[in-house]
Structures are given as structure tokens and as C-alpha cells.
Amino acid sequence: MAFNLKNRHLLSLVNHTEREIKFLLDLSRDLKRAKYAGTEQQRLKGKNIALIFEKTSTRTRCAFEVAAYDQGAHVTYIDPTSSQIGHKESMKDTARVLGRMYDAIEYRGFKQSVVNELAEYAGVPVFNGLTDEFHPTQMLADVLTMIENCEKPLSQISYVYIGDARNNVGNSLLLIGAKLGMDVRICAPKALLPEDSLVEMCQKFAAESGARITVTDDIDTAVKGVDFVHTDVWVSMGEPLETWGERIDMLMPYQVTPELMKRTGNPKVKFMHCLPAFHNSETKIGKQVAEKYPALANGIEVTEDVFESPANVAFEQAENRMHTIKAVMVASLA
């Protein structure tokens, strides 16, 4: 079957079929191999891409910029301090301006409704670099990383996301696993599980793909036999430190420790994290948390000994952001 993803948005993966997602993963693999072999061909020469960042980023910005440069495209980085977006100009008007100058627009920010509005009015492909609800480029990188680190067929790979499951990573891992027919498990305190509406939508996708979905607060049920353990930060950096106490108390049993990794019963289990991770007290935030909560001096959502172990494939994930983002741009713009 021939695929035509030309001029397609990437907003959440909700509207991408299983075969379209697999096509992007295959293209990511091919582009990665070409880069490693020195045989990459530039297919985006003459293309201009706007990168709108209302939230700061290291991996997403670098991945988009390097992917674009590798393919011969040019990018313009737009941050909140250097634009009129939201201050003197609406996103609707911004979309109609940038759509006349650029071949595509990336957006990283807050509400999903904003990137949807951008896509509605820009007239060019729009790529979601992260919103509060979804993180689709991260999911493509995550699945590529799991494929590379597991000999099983995709449909037999099992993974758990453990921690605060109401965020964009928890939502998106549930979604892509359901789309691709995987064994996906979401584990969190009951108050921090995904919204019922999202779970119901993903169960419908799972019925079509053959995916197995588990959403639970029971750790042993969730981690048993999994190939990969995912987590993410427990709190957003915009939240005051004083408000972390209740969240930390709730999530402490869900911290990824060597003991939790052993509870999987899989000696080959791998650890995954979208990064940045608070795995020690060397960062400013990590130090502040450790001073207030000494039990977290060795890491918040994951401990230092897990993060620095051979089980950690988070840096492969980070690299794969670039290869998968490149695939999204090539599929849409080449």
C-alpha cells in the first residue's frame, strides 16, 4: 500500500492510522541508517520551517533544528519574548501570517486547542512539539527506541508508564500503544490516572488493533513481565515547591527504583524517560527538593542507581527524537 502523508499535520496521533504510524517509524529507521552511513540525501532543500516555542526545550528544539538542517531546510526559532503571539496578536492571526511565509510550523506550548487552531488557519502542515495533553513526536521516538531494544515483534512488546499519568506523556503512551496493538499499561495513584474519556477512546483503538490496555493503581499487576518501564517528572516546573508535598506522598510508591525494576521479573527490562529527569540532587530543582524532602536526595521519579544503570535507554530515546521528527517533516514536506 502506498502512503501519502504529504501536507499532513501531526497534532496528537489520534487521526493517524496504525499503518501510517508504522510508515513513519520505518521512515525514521531508514533516515537514521542513512545518517549513520553518510548516505543521507537532502529532500527538504528550499523549505522554511517556523519553530514556535511557548515552553522552553532542549531536545525538541535541537531535534527539529538538526533534522531540518540535515535535510537542507531552514528554520526560524520564535520564543515568547521575541514575538507578538498572545500579546498583540492572536494565534489565529499568527497562523495566517506565518502560513504565508513558511512551509510548515512547529508549536510547543500549553493547550492542545492552540496547536489545533494553528493547524486550522495556517494553511501549511503543523507539528505538535508538545502540549499539555499530547506529545506525539516523543511517542514516535519512544516506539522506535523500544523496537531497537527488543527482539519481539511490535505487537508483543509490553511496557508500563508509572507515575503521574495525567500528563502528556502518560496520555500519549496510552494512545500510541492502543493504536499499534501493543501491551500498554498505565500505573498511577487513582487520582492521577488518565481521564476516562481518553481511556475509552483508546479502548476503541485497541479493539481494532488487538492492543491490550491495563489502567491500574496496582504496581505488581502493572509491571509484571514488562519489557520497558517508562516514567516522567512528578510535577511541572511552574508549580511552587510548597505544593509538591501531597503529590510526592502520593507518588512515592511509584518511584522507579532497583527494587521496582526487579518486580518486573524480567532481567532484560529497560528504563525509559523523555527527559529531563530528576535522578539526583545535582540540579537546582533537585537540590531544592532534596533539602525539603531528604528521602528524594537520590532522585525523585527515578533513583540515580537506575538512571545510571545499563538498563537506561533514555539517551537513545533523546537521539531518536531527531530521527523521528525528521521522518515527520520528510513525509509531510518532501
UniProtKB/Swiss-Prot annotation:
GO terms of molecular function: amino acid binding; ornithine carbamoyltransferase activity
Catalytic class of the enzyme: transferase
Reactions the enzyme catalyzes: carbamoyl phosphate + L-ornithine = L-citrulline + phosphate + H(+)
Residues binding L-ornithine, per UniProt: N168, D232, S236, M237
EC number: 2.1.3.3
SUPFAM superfamilies named among the record's database cross-references: Aspartate/ornithine carbamoyltransferase (SSF53671)
Pathway(s) this gene product operates in, as recorded in its UniProt entry: Amino-acid biosynthesis; L-arginine biosynthesis; L-arginine from L-ornithine and carbamoyl phosphate: step 1/3
GO cellular component: cytoplasm
Entry binding sites for carbamoyl phosphate: S57, T58, R59, T60, Q84, R108, H135, P136, T137, Q138, C274, L275, R321
InterPro entries listed in its UniProt record: Asp/Orn_carbamoyltranf_P-bd, Asp/Orn_carbamoylTrfase, Asp/Orn_carbamoylTrfase_sf, Asp_carbamoyltransf_Asp/Orn-bd, Orn/put_carbamltrans, OTCase_ArgI
Protein localization: Cytoplasm
One protein family per Pfam: OTCace_N
Primary localization class, coarse: cytoplasm
Origin superkingdom: Bacteria
Example GO biological process: citrulline biosynthetic process
Keyword annotations of the record: Amino-acid biosynthesis, Arginine biosynthesis, Cytoplasm, Transferase
Family: Belongs to the aspartate/ornithine carbamoyltransferase superfamily. OTCase family.
Function statement: Reversibly catalyzes the transfer of the carbamoyl group from carbamoyl phosphate (CP) to the N(epsilon) atom of ornithine (ORN) to produce L-citrulline.
Protein known as: Ornithine carbamoyltransferase
Lineage of the organism: Bacteria, Pseudomonadati, Pseudomonadota, Gammaproteobacteria, Pasteurellales
